[in-house]
Design a protein with these regions (language model features):
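Interfacial loop/helix-cap signal at membrane boundaries in integral membrane proteins
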Residues: 1-32, 135-160
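Membrane-spanning helices that line or support transport/gating and their immediate boundary helices
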Residues: 15, 47, 51-54, 58, ...
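Extended low-complexity intrinsically disordered regions
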Residues: 30-60, 64, 71, 287, ...
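Hydrophobic alpha-helical transmembrane segments and adjacent short intramembrane/lumenal linkers
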Residues: 114-123, 130, 135-262
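Cytosolic, positively charged, low-complexity intrinsically disordered regions immediately flanking transmembrane
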Residues: 242-328
């Protein structure tokens, strides 16, 4: 699978080297090739990244209204009323042009492209005498004779502390800043009383320290060539600049209204007071004391599910019934 993505990436690398190699010496040509390889590949998929970021922000912008509609939908008992609410939800999504699948789809392209980019750089820097994608054996051999400040690009990073340390510190700084900005953006739109979003935010917070530590450890103790450290620096710098641009666009075009901030603050309060757990515990005690109430509640939920199911069918078929329905 990764080899498929290596071919377009290696093709881009070959084209840049043909350009720079026509008027620069071998080492400088290859160094610039790596820089522009990162810029080209990440530049191509930047619109997909933006699409995912924008859909995430749009989802947050429409959430206060959607939450209100969902609250009404939970207590609906009439099919026609449920149909009206479902239509309002659909119109709300259309008004905001929200499509959650469009936010997820780019990941299926972005992740393999990043892996393909990393694999090309890693294999070109390796020791195997074989072509890499569209790069011929001659191209690979030329790359492996290239140096930066007298250090071969394919030497292990741990053998050249004086050269690698500044590049590694820069790379770790770039990725840490990028993660912190993304973390703060996520914090502003996270509902803390919902388990999955809250845990995803905690996971990202942990990654702020884990990722730099992992990269530092691998760089000094693993078989990582100097090329990869240089690639990290270029890649993380581009990602940081991209994130800053996205953040500026979000603040200007899609600012978060006070309703979103208020919803987040209320969710934090509910999470701290463990409101959901208290309600569940109270319901269990109430049902335990009155088993008939538990049966009545289960029957009501069943009727409510039937009403929603029929309402969704009607909305999907755009055919509202004139009289009472089976669910009623």
């Amino acid at each position: 699978m990764l080899e498929f993505f290596m071919y377009p990436v290696s093709g881009i690398m070959k084209l840049w080297h043909l350009l720079f190699g026509s008027f620069l010496d071998g080492s400088l040509a290859w160094i610039l090739t790596i820089v522009f390889l990162v810029v080209t590949v990440r530049g191509i998929i930047a619109p997909l990244n933006w699409l995912a970021v924008k859909q995430g922000r749009i989802g947050a912008l429409m959430r206060p209204e959607m939450t209100e509609l969902n609250a009404q939908l939970r207590h609906v008992t009439d099919v026609n009323e449920a149909v009206d609410l479902l239509i309002q939800q659909r119109e709300l999504k259309e008004r905001y042009k929200h499509n959650p699948m469009m936010g997820c789809f780019p990941s299926f392209i972005i992740v393999p492209a990043f892996l393909g980019l990393y694999q090309v750089v890693l294999r070109v820097s390796g020791s195997a005498n074989e072509p890499v994608g569209l790069l011929t054996l001659g191209d690979v051999s030329s790359f492996r004779t290239s140096t930066v400040f007298g250090v071969p690009l394919t030497d292990f990073a741990r053998e050249h502390h004086d050269l690698v340390l500044p590049m590694l510190i820069a790379a770790l700084t770039f990725t840490s800043l990028n993660t912190l900005i993304t973390l703060y953006r996520g914090y502003l739109t996270t509902l803390f009383d919902q388990k999955i979003p809250r845990r995803l935010l905690w996971f990202m917070a942990i990654m702020v320290t884990i990722i730099p530590w992992m990269l530092w450890t691998v760089a000094w103790h693993g078989p990582i060539p100097v090329t990869i450290i240089f690639y990290w620096g270029c890649s993380y710098l581009f990602t940081l600049l991209q994130t800053l641009v996205y953040e500026a666009i979000l603040r200007k075009r899609y600012p978060l209204p006070e309703a979103v901030h208020e919803q987040r603050r209320e969710s934090i309060q509910r999470w701290r007071t463990k409101e959901k757990k208290r309600k569940k515990k109270a319901a269990k005690e109430r049902f335990k004391a009155n088993p008939e109430q538990k049966e009545a509640s289960a029957a009501a939920r069943k009727r409510h599910s039937a009403v929603l199911a029929e309402a969704r069918k009607i909305v999907k078929s755009n055919n509202r019934p004139e009289g009472p329905t089976a669910a009623e």
